[in-house]
């Protein structure tokens, strides 16, 4: 089994094509298959090596690896061979209409109630007419000639049986007048040459698939298995304001864990519940492409945020040890305590600093804090220290427990909310507790 992910390096990856990449990757890894990364960069003016590097970085960040990769710009010689072969066999023909002329035809067809399908008038041109057009400075574009008598059928892994009548489809342009190949011919050539067995993409490519099946047949190659995922809809206003959906760059900036994104995207639109999972292999083992519904799915940023904290709660110390070392946290005990109290990993550093560094205590009642200082239990802090401390203070002062907890937390952490104070005292330590109470 071989799947492929084929991004165009003309911009950043967004959640839509990352979802496709994840599904492709998990689909083949579940079957011990291979995964191919291909960059569709035939439009050299719009493609940028910067985006190739960004895409590679983002895929690695998510956890996707690949068995081989290449750029289509390295294979123009091969595309030219296939192009000339298909011209020779009568599958590709030259057209001389300008964009303006094609637009007029399209509008006229729509006005008359006909589908805007190319009328193949270029096939009626004589050699003299073609020469005259070229003498006028017109450069041809080229189309693949569809078999309009065929209804293309395939059993889609997600959408079930699909039938496309090619009589309602225009012959696709495979090469523009400027000599640049469109998506169609290089994509089909690569899929055939590299023996891609399974193609996963968005349902907006369904008509393209019918066209490509005919092109694959023209090359006398084996038809791969297709799966068309329903498109994602974005309901969060925060997302809708971003052009092109939500890109991985902004996901990173929002401090979403890779496995929170993965957990969400591979289950979104399936019959399975969306649950946090910190282990990629368990998601691969349970993956089933047939679980995807053919109905569109709603992407919710707020739901992904909720998953983020749950993923952090599942992460073992070994999974985050390098990241913890980078911020000066070497304690597994602290990680297992704090992971249940954070929404983003960056909050670990905040609470470690509160425990171990100089902070500005917030003293709400100086007299009460003096009493608390004198009532502090002897010895090192443990999980019983806070309850003993509170009991002793309340024997001296008439104060509600909730108010007392707030006063102590503010004095010791500089905040009014946070992780369980009884356990936090252990990490703050007796020396820091004394210093913070004594200062004021």
UniProtKB/Swiss-Prot annotation:
A motif ('HIGH' region) lies at residues 7-17. ATP binds at residue 241. GO terms for cellular component: cytoplasm. Keywords: Aminoacyl-tRNA synthetase, ATP-binding, Cytoplasm, Ligase, Nucleotide-binding, Protein biosynthesis. InterPro entries: aa-tRNA-synth_I_cd-bd (IPR045462), aa-tRNA-synth_I_codon-bd_sub2 (IPR020751), aa-tRNA-synth_I_CS (IPR001412), aa_tRNA-synth_I_cd-bd_sf (IPR008925), Glu-tRNA-ligase_bac/mito (IPR004527), Glu/Gln-tRNA-synth (IPR000924), Glu/Gln-tRNA-synth_Ib_cat-dom (IPR020058), GluQ/Sye (IPR049940). Its EC number is 6.1.1.17. A motif ('KMSKS' region) lies at residues 238-242. Its main location: cytoplasm. PROSITE patterns: AA_TRNA_LIGASE_I. It catalyses: tRNA(Glu) + L-glutamate + ATP = L-glutamyl-tRNA(Glu) + AMP + diphosphate. One of its GO terms (molecular function) is ATP binding. It is found in: Cytoplasm. It is an enzyme of class 6 (ligase). It comes from the Bacteria. Pfam families: Anticodon_2, tRNA-synt_1c. GO terms for biological process: glutamyl-tRNA aminoacylation. Monomer. Catalyzes the attachment of glutamate to tRNA(Glu) in a two-step reaction: glutamate is first activated by ATP to form Glu-AMP and then transferred to the acceptor end of tRNA(Glu). Belongs to the class-I aminoacyl-tRNA synthetase family. Glutamate--tRNA ligase type 1 subfamily. This is Glutamate--tRNA ligase 2. It comes from Wolbachia pipientis wMel. The lineage of its organism: Bacteria, Pseudomonadati, Pseudomonadota, Alphaproteobacteria, Rickettsiales.
């Amino acid at each position: 089994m071989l799947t492929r992910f084929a991004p165009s390096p003309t911009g950043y990856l967004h959640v839509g094509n990352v979802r496709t990449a994840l599904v492709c990757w998990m689909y083949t890894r579940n079957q011990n298959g291979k995964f191919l990364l291909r960059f569709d960069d035939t439009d050299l003016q719009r493609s940028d090596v910067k985006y190739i590097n960004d895409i590679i970085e983002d895929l690695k960040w998510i956890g996707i690896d690949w068995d081989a990769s290449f750029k289509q710009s390295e294979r123009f010689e091969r595309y030219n061979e296939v192009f000339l072969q298909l011209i020779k066999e009568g599958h590709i023909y030259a057209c001389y209409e300008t964009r303006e002329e094609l637009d007029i035809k399209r509008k006229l067809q729509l006005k008359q109630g006909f589908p805007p399908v190319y009328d193949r008038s270029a096939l009626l041109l004589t050699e003299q007419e073609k020469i005259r057009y070229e003498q006028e400075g017109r450069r041809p574009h080229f189309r693949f000639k569809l078999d309009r008598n065929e209804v293309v059928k395939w059993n889609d892994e997600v959408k079930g049986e699909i039938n496309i009548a090619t009589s309602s489809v225009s012959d696709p342009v495979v090469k523009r007048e400027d000599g640049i190949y469109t998506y169609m011919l290089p994509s089909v050539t690569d899929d055939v040459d590299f023996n891609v067995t399974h193609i996963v993409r968005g349902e907006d490519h369904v008509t393209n698939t019918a066209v490509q099946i005919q092109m694959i047949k023209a090359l006398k190659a084996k038809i791969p298995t297709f799966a068309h995922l329903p498109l994602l809809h974005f309901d969060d206003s925060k997302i809708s304001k971003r052009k092109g959906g939500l890109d991985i760059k902004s996901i990173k900036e929002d401090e979403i864990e890779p496995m929170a994104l993965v957990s969400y995207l591979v289950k979104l639109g399936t019959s399975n519940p969306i649950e946090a999972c910190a282990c990629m292999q368990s998601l691969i083992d349970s993956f089933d492409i047939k679980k995807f519904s053919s109905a569109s799915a709603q992407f919710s940023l707020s739901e992904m945020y909720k998953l983020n904290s749950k993923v952090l709660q599942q992460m073992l110390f070994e999974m985050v040890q390098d990241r913890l070392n980078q911020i000066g946290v070497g304690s597994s005990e602290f990680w297992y305590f704090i992971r249940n109290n954070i929404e983003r990993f960056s909050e670990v550093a905040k609470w470690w600093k509160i425990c171990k560094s100089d902070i500005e205590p917030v003293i709400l009642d100086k007299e009460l804090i003096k009493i608390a200082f004198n009532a502090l239990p002897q010895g090192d802090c443990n999980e019983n220290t806070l309850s003993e401390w509170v009991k002793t203070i309340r024997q001296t002062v008439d104060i509600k427990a909730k108010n007392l907890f707030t006063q102590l937390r503010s004095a010791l952490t500089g905040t009014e909310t946070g992780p369980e104070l009884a356990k936090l005292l252990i990490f703050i330590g007796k020396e820091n507790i004394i210093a913070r109470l004594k200062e004021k």
